[in-house]
Every structure is written in structure tokens, then in C-alpha cells.
Amino acid sequence: MQVRKRRGLLDVSTAVLVGILAGFLGVVLAASGVLSFGKEASSKGDSSLETVLALSFEGTTEGVVPFGKDVVLTASQDVAADGEYSLKVENRTSPWDGVEIDLTGKVKSGADYLLSFQVYQSSDAPQLFNVVARTEDEKGERYDVILDKVVVSDHWKEILVPFSPTFEGTPAKYSLIIVASKNTNFNFYLDKVQVLAPKESGPKVIYETSFENGVGDWQPRGDVNIEASSEVAHSGKSSLFISNRQKGWQGAQINLKGILKTGKTYAFEAWVYQNSGQDQTIIMTMQRKYSSDASTQYEWIKSATVPSGQWVQLSGTYTIPAGVTVEDLTLYFESQNPTLEFYVDDVKIVDTTSAEIKIEMEPEKEIPALKEVLKDYFKVGVALPSKVFLNPKDIELITKHFNSITAENEMKPESLLAGIENGKLKFRFETADKYIQFVEENGMVIRGHTLVWHNQTPDWFFKDENGNLLSKEAMTERLKEYIHTVVGHFKGKVYAWDVVNEAVDPNQPDGLRRSTWYQIMGPDYIELAFKFAREADPDAKLFYNDYNTFEPRKRDIIYNLVKDLKEKGLIDGIGMQCHISLATDIKQIEEAIKKFSTIPGIEIHITELDMSVYRDSSSNYPEAPRTALIEQAHKMMQLFEIFKKYSNVITNVTFWGLKDDYSWRATRRNDWPLIFDKDHQAKLAYWAIVAPEVLPPLPKESRISEGEAVVVGMMDDSYLMSKPIEILDEEGNVKATIRAVWKDSTIYIYGEVQDKTKKPAEDGVAIFINPNNERTPYLQPDDTYAVLWTNWKTEVNREDVQVKKFVGPGFRRYSFEMSITIPGVEFKKDSYIGFDAAVIDDGKWYSWSDTTNSQKTNTMNYGTLKLEGIMVATAKYGTPVIDGEIDEIWNTTEEIETKAVAMGSLDKNATAKVRVLWDENYLYVLAIVKDPVLNKDNSNPWEQDSVEIFIDENNHKTGYYEDDDAQFRVNYMNEQTFGTGGSPARFKTAVKLIEGGYIVEAAIKWKTIKPTPNTVIGFNIQVNDANEKGQRVGIISWSDPTNNSWRDPSKFGNLRLIK
């Protein structure tokens, strides 16, 4: 390659040449995201690729056009990646101004392509670049962001964007637009633009069945029935019917070991059907075991919500790596509802590899080293499997970014114990010693994980030669021998140990897990473990390590445990694992750190950090959604702001995995939980830590209820039915709280704004509405905005829009109310609209969703509102007697029913009819539960036949529990248990068994409010249904079909207290 370097450096190591073409020196692709170029790509010779478009800009701008009315494109000799010229992009005035590459007529819908280009910018700071696919077809015009990539200054960056166009019919336009959407105050350069495609070869169908000739090679999975049924069929006359299921994993399966080959990617398709009367989740899963796997793995290919009475397609891809030895590959269908009967039809497996473009990338040398960015705060670590020591790319990434490591599994008891001989433990340290060698050679430190754990410890370790459990005395001696030997072997080499791991169970009376350790030794094993570790290496730092340390009940138990050990001089710190997700409340993590930090002399290590891109356990994405990756980055930013804030006590932050495909979470589904992707490339989550200012805005989501209001500056009751929307300032303080409702063609908005200054012409609020919810880099005709200044003047973008307004006076704050009526628009229930709101304070904008504050020019970063009707009920004033009898006063209040199904079905599982009363001291609940089979055998109280009550006193409907939120549970034997915020002091119950079920009467003491008539609180009630085997088979509540009320009050219904 000819390289002309004028300013900065050209990265020529971003891609490794991999021979996928014979006798042709051209463009070569490998396994991830950037190309490396030899000669110009062409279709000559025996090539696997062909060139769709190639642009070099040598004295010309041909092949591209400006996107944006003021953009200027020139062929420039300022700087070039290859040859003498590059394309200079300047005079951008909108964030979505850039360069458009027209591919109309050059690409096909559904085909795979690669856009490769090199980009350069010299702004002296990292900058975010985007690629946007523009489509105009029979469905209309749309703009989809298909790439977010951060590029450092003064460096030619080679970028590869896989894309697959999707359009209906012959499109009027299909193009790709390259922009830098965060800033317009710099110019950038493009060079060596190419679009490539694999040559036509056609996917190959390797397996297909429609069950017209019976079940074939399919087998029952577990004790179930499978048969070819003519009851329903997606095609033909038959489908596969699975019945008599009792457990979630049970279903139908087929052995594919002899059918699927290594080094190939397969597309799986199947159609599924169920007629339970409710939506159900059905999953297509691969059970696999390679010789390199320690145990069998279960990986979701696709999960889908299947409406009752409809056929739904499950489709996804599955890759078998080259070079592995396959021991088991079994495809099966399952459901999280353990008793669901369902049908499968038209199963197809396609070998896609022949049409696949492969890419391989090197770690990015030019980006900042994480350990250098954070060196003034704490050590930065990573958990590693031993295989990384054989991979030069892994080693490069590790040594660049980290100064601490943890052996992922190789220092756990099952890895170190080789057996027992003559009563003495035998050990194997060979693999673990490789970690010590690595840190010594690279100037790092290592954390030891873990000494005492209920998992990954051999069963024989707890038994004598006759297979009986050891006595407490013998177990104590074995514990001492193990810890003295292991810690002694690594004395002076391992700087910190997770001595005891996951010993706390908040559902136990004393808060401790009933492990084999506890069974033999009681709680004493914890203190003894620390005592023996301190004896073996007095200089090593000793930690108690656990997950979900931020959940309030578990947090408090850990606090008391560690405080006691610290006072005895036996412990140095707390290990907070932080296996979290997008649903995790970051505020709770800070509260836990804050509480733990009050223990004198304590250290905190974040020991196992990863963040799933999911909010639940059932979703399964074929590719990580862009919005999820952006949200992951924003949460990572918040998390590290907290870590740095408490760096006086936090001394190590360790990621549990080097890159996404190495994560322990990538078993049933891809979670994409780490800061580097499978190709060693930095994700947005990495930049959230290093340069958070480059992150794309996080489009917000909320929902509002149907309702009307009179615009007179008062918050009508209808507003209380909608979830509040908060606008924050740079420090995270609430700048404004607004509520909105909708009716016909009008949106009503009421808000309260914090504003310390009084500048009527420079203070105000702006409301933006995108009725069709289409995201475009310009305003469409229906897009509407209205700016209301505190001097009552308004600015609107459309003359036909009707705006009613009110601005209320106030000291250091003010209220406002608006109604915006848009002619020609009719809002409908369960539809979505684009929406944003901004506060203007002294001329400065603070926005809810689009933090670039460019809402007047485009809708790309508007938030989304779902127009819905939240469950609403009333509770009458009155005080019943809590005795299990139905007093007459209960008949004075409204009856509601549990109909929101999270598991099971309305006709087969337990439900309840519910009434609610209130007075100044208590909220009262009556539930008449229909449940003919009562069981409480399960040790988990939420899996017993029981009723759960959830309240949100301030009705904030946050995605996490605030201090006023609480969860209470009582089973049919009147045994109480509690989730976050609940306690026996606030909960009175009486239960009476009746024919076909039971009655629950409960009183919940108010905690943070003094209720008055017309107060609206958040409320939900849930019925848990166990079968005769003690398995939970039903979860049906009043308002939340997601089964997330235990951690997320946002889907509670609204309960109005009336006289």
C-alpha cells in the first residue's frame, strides 16, 4: 500500500490479511470489523468478493454528494490515507450534515455488504462518527444509524461497516451517509471508500421438515409427549405438538452433531404456535458441548413472545467455531412457562457460510490506555481464562489497558484440588502459576479468587473416606489445611484474596446461605476462613465477595458481617461483584458504597463488573440493539463517576471478562456485557469511561395516559395518571418535572421548573412532538414544537398549531401548563410518538432526550412516548378488622382482578379478586384467591402459593425502588416474607382457607406520606401459583405482565384514594 502521510499517522495494522481467496491479491476479510487493502478490489481472478463501489478522491469528488444544504466537499491535499488526495468535509451546520454515498440500484434488499472507509479528524479530541442508512421506498422515508464509532484526533482510522439493506420493491433511494453527529465545529476527511459484496453463491438448505411424515428424528426432551398433529399447521396438514410439560427446559429436540460442521454459520428458522389464551415466550435453544468446555452450555438462538392463536417465526443464526471438537449439538424448543403446550412447524437450517463476509481486527493501538486514564483513582483489572496466554491479540489488549488480573476459574477449589491421599489434600498449581508468571513479567498485580465458596468445590472435599459429611472439627482442620496451603503457595504474589464468596442469603433468618459449609460448621466457617488466611499471608488484603450487594436487605446483612470481622482485624475489604444489567438501579449501587465506606478503614473492590444489555431474562437479540449499547454506555459512565467519587475507598475495579465473546454470560444468549467487543475493539462503554463527552445521546422512553386538562396552571388529577418525566442538569440534579396526557389530537403538559434566576425573555420551556415517530435529520411536515417563555410569549414552527398556555409565578421556581393541538393528527391508544422537552435557563438548554439540543432541526434523538391507559382503580376510605373475615365495609369499595399474566394462563392458574381500603394509618387489602392446589414446599417464598402486594407511595414510577416503595408477601399459611422496603413492623395479615382457595386480609402501614382524599399511589398485587410438586407455574398480577414488580415500580397501576 502506498501511504502518503501529511499530518498524523495511518493505521495499517487494524486488519489482518486472511486468505479467503486463491490466486488473487485484493481485498481480504477476516473475523470482525476492519479491512486491509492490497491492490484495488476487483472481480478478476478467483476472488470471493466483488467491488460494488470504489472511490479514491484523486482530484475529484465524484461518487459522493453533500448531505446538508451548507456542506462543502472538496478533493483536498491537506492529508491523505492513500494517494495524493482525500475528501474534505467542511461547513457543517447541523449535527447530521455530512457525506452521502448513493447506492440506489447498486445493492439488493436482504443481501450482505461491507462499507469500508478511512476517516481523519484533527480537532484535538476524540469525535463520534456515524453511518446512517437512508431508505426511500413504498413504506416511506427512513434513516437508520448503523454505526457509532469514536475516532481519535490526528490519526487515519480505517472503519468497516457491515450492512444489509431492507426495502420494499424498487427503492427511490438507498444511500449511506457519513456524519459526525455530536459536533459541527471541525472538518473531517474521508479516503479509500469501498463497498464490497460476496459473490453470488447461494445459501444451502441442509435440513428441513414440516412434520408431514411424522416426528422423524425429533425426540422428547424430558418426560413429555411429542407427536405429529393435524390440529393446526403452519403449512401442509401437520405440525409437531409438545404436551405434558412440567419444567421449562422440557420440549422437543433433535441431535445435530452429525449435521452441523465446524467453522460455519447456520441460519435457523421455525414457526411456533400456542393457544393458552395469553401471550407466551417460546425459545429455540442449542445445547452444545465442545471438548474445551468444562460443562454443557445452553445458548438461546431466538426467543419470542407468541400471542395465543397465532403462528410466530423464530429465526436466528448460530456459529460453530473452526477448530473445535464437537461432543454434543442438540437443537430444542422450550418455554419459560413449564406447563405450556405448543406446536412447532417448518423447521429449516441453512448453511450461510458460503455467502458470509468475514472480518478480523487488531486491537486499537491509538486509543487511550484505560489504566492510564484511571491511574489517579484505582487499579483496573480484568478476569481471564488461561487461553488468553496463547493469543497475542488478547495479550496486547490486556497489557495495554489493565494493571490487575484475576483468574476466572483457575484459582477456585475445583481447579486447585487434585484429590486426597492418606488424609492429606493434593494440589495442582501449574495453571495458576502461569498467572503469577504473567503479572510478574508485565508489572501487574493479581487478585486471588476464591478460597471458600459453595460452588466449584468438589463434593468429596466435605466428606470422609466413607462418603459421610465431615464433623465440624474435621471440616475445620480441612479448611485450615486448604487455606494455609493455597495462600501459602502464593504468599507475597497474590495481593488480595476473595476469602469467602457469596455466603449471604437475605431470605434466611440469620441472613446466611444454607451451603454445605454452613450445614457442617454453622456460621463459624466465615470467621475461621479469614483467620486462617490472615495466618497464611499477613500482608495480603482479605475480602468478603458477593453479588447484588446493592440490594438493601442483602447490603445491610453484608455491612454487619464485615463490620464485625473488621473490628476483629480479620478483613480488609468488601468485594462488590456488580454483575448488573440495564435494569439495575445505579443509585442503589452508590447507596451501598456509601454505607460500606462508613466502616472504619474498609477498602472496596469492584470485583466482577459486567453489564448485560437486557432488562429481563427472556429477551434474546440476534444482534445487540444500538439503543441498548448506548444505554449501556451511559450507565457505565454513571457507574464510573460514582467509582471515582468514592476512590478514597474503592481501590480496584475489575471487569469480569476481556471481551464480549469471552463473557461467562454468553451461554443462553449474547449479553454483550463488557467494554471491548469480540473483535478486540473498544465499544461505546469503553468511551463512557475514557471520554464520556463523545457518547451519542440516549433516546429516552416513557409512557403517558389518556386524559384531558383545563389549562389554568394547576395540575389536574389526570396528570397524576402519567409517569413523571425528569429533565436533569449536568450534575444530575432535577431541573424540571413534567407530566403529560393525551386526547384526540392534543397533548397536555404540566411542569414545575427549578430556576434561580428571573430572566423572562431567556427562561422558558420547549415541547417537541413527532406524531409519526419517524426519525429524520430534518423536520417533517407533521413535526411540531412550541417554546413557551416565562414572559408568556410563544414560538411555534407551524401556524396551524393551537397552543394554550399558562406560566405560574414562583420564587426560584415556576410552574407551566400547555396544550398543543395538531390539526390532522389523531393520537391512538397503544401507539408511539416522538417527544422531547427542554428547559431554557438564562439561554442555556437542558433537554430530556436530545442532549445535543438540536430538536429544532431534526428528530433523530427525540425520545419515545407510548400512549396508553395505565391500570387505574379506587380505594374507598374505611377501616376493616384484619381477621380473615370479609367485613361489610369491603363491599363499599371497587373490586379489581388479577389478569396480567407473566406466567401461566387465566384459565389454569391462580387468580384473585381484590378490594382496597385506606385510612390515615394504613392501606388495607382484601384478596380472595382462587387456587384449588396449595403448596409451600419450595424454599423460595416467591415460588410458594402466595400473594404479593407492591406500593409506591409517591407514585414516581421509577425503574427502581425508592425509599417509599415496598414489596410485601404472605402465603396461604399466613407466613410473611418481604422484598425491598417491606418489613414485619408495617405488615399485618390474616389468612383463611376456603373451598378452592384462600382469603388474605392485609394492612400496610404508611411510611412516607399522610394520605388525603384524591391522593394517587402506585399499586400492584400479584398471585404466585405453585403446583403439587412445589414448582411455581403461575404469576398473575393486576398491572404488570413482566414479573418485574419486585425491582421495578414503573409498571405499577394507579390507585386513587377517595372518601
UniProtKB/Swiss-Prot annotation:
Catalytic activity line of the entry: Endohydrolysis of (1->4)-beta-D-xylosidic linkages in xylans
Main enzyme class: hydrolase
Catalytic residues (positions): E502 (proton donor), E608 (nucleophile)
Ranges of residues in domain GH10: 364-692
EC number annotated for this UniProt entry: 3.2.1.8
Start and end residues of each CBM-cenC domain: 700-870, 871-1059
pH dependence, entry free text: Optimum pH is 6.2.
UniProt keyword list: Carbohydrate metabolism, Glycosidase, Hydrolase, Polysaccharide degradation, Repeat, Signal, Xylan degradation
Temperature-related behavior of activity: Optimum temperature is 90 degrees Celsius. Thermostable.
UniProt region (A-1), positions on chain: 47-199
Example GO biological process: xylan catabolic process
Region (A-2): 200-354
A GO molecular function held by the record: carbohydrate binding
Residues in the signal sequence: 1-30
One Pfam family of this chain: CBM_4_9
Family: Belongs to the glycosyl hydrolase 10 (cellulase F) family.
Domain observations: The C-terminal CBM-CenC domains mediate the binding of XynA to microcrystalline cellulose. CBM-CenC 2 alone can also promote cellulose binding.
Designated name of the protein: Endo-1,4-beta-xylanase A
